[in-house]
């Protein structure tokens, strides 16, 4: 598994746990990093950056996702999908070195592995529309 995909998976683990426990993502991240064996994985820095950035911009990310998820509220989305969308939208808006197509395809691939059968298509649609918005 490529390093950035591993980082996204780790970020997803932290965000998912924070979501389920209703805790701040950065607080869950601190416990997660503390539990990791040493030496720390090389991709950990990118995962930490994702979680910290998402925590800072969470309200804006959720607002965008909710506005483009036609017929769905954030609370109604599966937690995995909601958090994959947060990761991808953060990358679309704030991580210049990641191409939009890569951010979207990585989220879709993780959804294919970890969520419902409908999730990849659902995320691809939302993220594609948000990517169009982000490039205007």
Curated annotation (Swiss-Prot):
InterPro entries: NusB-like_sf, NusB_fam, NusB_RsmB_TIM44. One of its GO terms (molecular function) is RNA binding. One of its GO terms (cellular component) is cytosol. Keywords: RNA-binding, Transcription, Transcription antitermination, Transcription regulation. SUPFAM superfamilies: NusB-like. Pfam families: NusB. It comes from the Bacteria. Involved in transcription antitermination. Required for transcription of ribosomal RNA (rRNA) genes. Binds specifically to the boxA antiterminator sequence of the ribosomal RNA (rrn) operons. Belongs to the NusB family. This is Transcription antitermination protein NusB. The gene is nusB.
């Amino acid at each position: 598994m490529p390093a950035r995909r591993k980082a996204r998976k780790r970020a997803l683990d932290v965000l998912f746990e924070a979501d389920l426990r209703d805790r701040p993502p950065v607080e869950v991240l601190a416990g997660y990093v503390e539990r990791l064996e040493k030496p720390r994985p090389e991709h950990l820095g990118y995962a930490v950056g994702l979680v910290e950035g998402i925590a800072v911009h969470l309200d804006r990310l959720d607002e965008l996702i909710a506005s483009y998820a036609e017929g769905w509220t954030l609370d109604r989305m599966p937690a995995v999908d909601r958090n994959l969308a947060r990761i991808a939208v953060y990358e679309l808006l704030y991580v210049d070195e990641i191409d939009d197509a890569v951010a979207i395809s990585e989220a879709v691939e993780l959804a294919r592995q970890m969520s419902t059968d409908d999730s990849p298509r659902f995320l691809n649609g939302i993220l594609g529309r948000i990517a169009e918005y982000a490039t205007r």
